[in-house]
Structures are given as structure tokens and as C-alpha cells.
Amino acid sequence: MRIEMKNISKAFNGNPVLKNAQFMIETGEVHALMGENGAGKSTLMKILTGVYKKDGGTITIDGQEHTFKNAKEAEEYGIAFIHQELNILSNLTVAENMFLGKELMYGKTGILRTRQMNAIAQQQLAELGLHVKGAMLAGELSVGQQQIIEIAKALMTNASVIIMDEPTAALTDREIETLFTVINKLRKEGVSFVYISHRMEEIFSICDTITILRDGEYVGKRSIPETSFDEVVSMMVGRSIGERYPERNSQVGDVIFEIRNGTKKGKFENVSFQVRKGEILGVAGLMGACRTDIMKAIFGYEPLDSGQIFINGQEVKIDSPIDAIRQRIAFITEDRKSEGLVLDFSIRENLALPNLESLSKGSVLSDELEQQFTADMMKLLNVKASSGEQAVKSLSGGNQQKVVIAKWLGIHPQLLILDEPTRGVDVGAKKEIYSIMNKLTEQGDAVIMVSSELPEVLGMSDRVLVIHEGKVGGILEKDEASQESIMALATGGE
């Protein structure tokens, strides 16, 4: 299937989101669609699949002009959209998910052909390298396995083009390898993939071509063998952003935070490490190693069962997030949408939440202080929005992440814990987040950064703490740290 979109335009409430955008994909091609958050990538694909109606432009499929009324119509024609939030119902079986809306029945009796559906589902998944029973509950599978189910569902509707939005955001390295194996197998069979992602290494590994959008406009198309990371970034942001990771200029000082023999039954045990003033401590490990659980314990979300925590040499008890905030510890969670933000609230309201005391006069929240704080934070972090009254759910992923960071900067943290700080964030916003981390450490504060992206860990960390199955696998100095040395410790080696 060959798809060509020309001069596509779209506006919401008079605000242009797409302006003469273009996109073309060939049969059997893996085509990356890139751009900063808010560039219009998802909107363009939603227009292709009938979720949104275009204001102008043409869509041709195999030479014939087409416009789909809804996503179901596009799916029936052979174009499937697998969203970042997977459409899997965890309380249904694998087969029930795959046949949802197209169940096999005995005539018109309403009785399901359960055994047959289980067998077909099992066979379809086996062909994609996933060997699970059709009768198994989908909620018992990993995110990577659920993603393969989504691809199998698309193939059952004879999909010729599969659109994937941030497909590897929550996958382990092994699951990413499995996904790429499936993509490579299917492209040889003529299936095309639109691959929306910010992960450069993956795009240069799996894709054939890149189309770049900027501010809703088509910037250009490049063949992977004929382009470079720097060229793609420059096309995305309209300028060269210089070095990928900003230079570290902070002076590492005394120990600001220490945990000794921290234990949470069933999750991690005897975890001990220190963080110094002016330091970024990177935390690496495989998915399931309990890195996030350790950070949640430090912040008092799920307090330690045993062990000690010291701040500036003094032992402290942290049994709740309030205790942590009093010690000027801030925690930016990996799941910004469900744990970091109140999506229906405005930017101003979200920024105020952990800062109510400092934004109040007496016991009354000061509108003047709140407005000034919002303006200051939006300027400091370059939050792109119409005003502080804009709902955070309408912001791009990068700007949402900046709001999460901004609200915690209000407590003037001496220790900032960042869990997957740049997940789903474009390359320009990543650089801004890295600069914020550097500014904090340059003024003597400390940062703990949990990340599954090893280039990020290596590029930003002064030392690297590696967690393996809930225990400290090792701590590497900057000159000792490499992808190989980190992975060796993460897998239980030395």
C-alpha cells in the first residue's frame, strides 16, 4: 500500500496545528515521523485514520483519493493505529482482546466459538514469535507482549500499514529486540510501518526513511543511510542545539544524602549509596530491577521497612512524601500523567500544589503570589503555552514534563530525584531538561536520575549506580562507566 498526504492543513479553535504538511510511505517501508512535541505528528496520523477531519489537502492511497470518516473505516481498509497507551483490556483473555468486536459465534445463537478463537489467536501470535495461550488473561502479560498482541490484532484485519506511536517507551531492551524482529519479518511481507518516536538510536536502527515536521509544517524527508543525528535534530528544531549533552561544570562537594541498608520486603534489600552536593548520580538497571521502588521509598511513597536515611549527616525519618518535602527532597515520577500532574487542572493550579504554604499570606492562598510564581516558572523552564490558565492535558509531552519539574523547583530542593525524566520528550526539550539539572548542581544541589536510556546515563552522570534484582550491583565512576560495564552489572556480572 502506497500512501501520499499532500498539503494537509488543520486548525483547532482557529489555532493552526498543521500547515501544508506532507507525508508519503511506500509498501514494505518502515518510515519514521519525527518532530518536537507539538509538531503535529499525531494529528497528521489521526487525519489519515479518520479520527480528525482535515481542513485542506489530499490523501491518496495507491493513486486513488481517499478520506476516512472514522478509525474503524480506516482499519477496514488496512490502516491500523497502535497508540502509546495500548488498547488492551487486562481483564479479558488474549483471544478475547484479539477478537473484540469481531467475535466468532455459532450462527446467530450468540454463543462464542471460544476454543476456535483461542486456537487462532495462539497461532497468530506464534507466527510473530510470541508463544502464549489464547485463554491467558492479557493483564498477566508484559507491556512488550501486549504490544505484539496489538500488532496481531491489526494483522487480523489485514492491515497493510501499521502506525506505532512511541512503541518502545515502556519496553525492556529484550522486548525492543523482539519488536524489531517482528517489524523486520512483516516488512519483508509488504507491511509498512509509520514509526513515531524521539529515540534516535532506534530510528537509525529500524527505519528506512525519516519525515520531519516542525510547527505543523513539512521540513523534509531523508533516507537513513544518507543523513545523520545532527542533521535530523537541526531539521526538527530549526537550529543546531550543539552537543547532545551539555557540559558539566559543577563542583562536587560533601555528602548531601545517604541511604544505609535500605530494605523493602519483596522488592529490594540492603541498598546503600551516597549522593554529594553538585553531583548527578545516574541510576541504571534492567526493567524490574526495582529502581523506581527505591526512589519511592526515599521519597516516602512506600517507606522503608528497615534501613537508615541521612541528610547532611543527620539521620532523618521519611515515612511520607510530606516528610521528604520538609527535607527539601523532590521526586519527579516516571508516570507524569497519572502521578505527576492533575491533567484537568491548569498550569497555575498544578504549580501551586506542592507550594501552597509559600504561596499563601497567612492561611489564604495569594492570587498575586500564585500568578507571579507561575509566570516565573514558565519563563525559567520555557514552558510553551497560551497562558498559565491553559489545562496541562492540552500541552505537549515535553511541556507537561517541564510543568512537573517546575512545581517541584518551588520547594528549592536540595535533592531532586528524576525518574525517566525525558521519556516521550523531544530532543529540544531533553536539552532544556539537562540544562535545568546542570543549573541545580552548579548551585550545590544534588540530582538522582533514573533512566533506561544508557546514552543519557553516560552523558549526564558523574557516577552511575547500577541496580540488579533489588540490590546494588555496583557503583561506577565516570571514567569506568560504559554501556558494557553497566550492562554487566545490571545482569548480575562484575
UniProtKB/Swiss-Prot annotation:
A GO term, aspect molecular function: ATP hydrolysis activity
Annotated SMART domains: AAA
Membrane topology: Peripheral membrane protein
GO annotation, cellular component aspect: plasma membrane
Gene field: rbsA
Reactions accelerated catalytically: D-ribose(out) + ATP + H2O = D-ribose(in) + ADP + phosphate + H(+)
Membership in a protein family: Belongs to the ABC transporter superfamily. Ribose importer (TC 3.A.1.2.1) family.
Name of the protein in its database record: Ribose import ATP-binding protein RbsA
Binding of ATP, residues: G35, E36, N37, G38, A39, G40, K41, S42
Enzyme Commission identifier(s): 7.5.2.7
Family annotation (Gene3D superfamilies): P-loop containing nucleotide triphosphate hydrolases
Subcellular location: Cell membrane
Cross-referenced SUPFAM superfamilies: P-loop containing nucleoside triphosphate hydrolases
Function noted in UniProt: Part of the ABC transporter complex RbsABC involved in ribose import. Responsible for energy coupling to the transport system.
Subunit structure: The complex is composed of an ATP-binding protein (RbsA), two transmembrane proteins (RbsC) and a solute-binding protein (RbsB).
Top EC category: translocase
All copies of domain ABC transporter, residue ranges: 3-240, 250-494
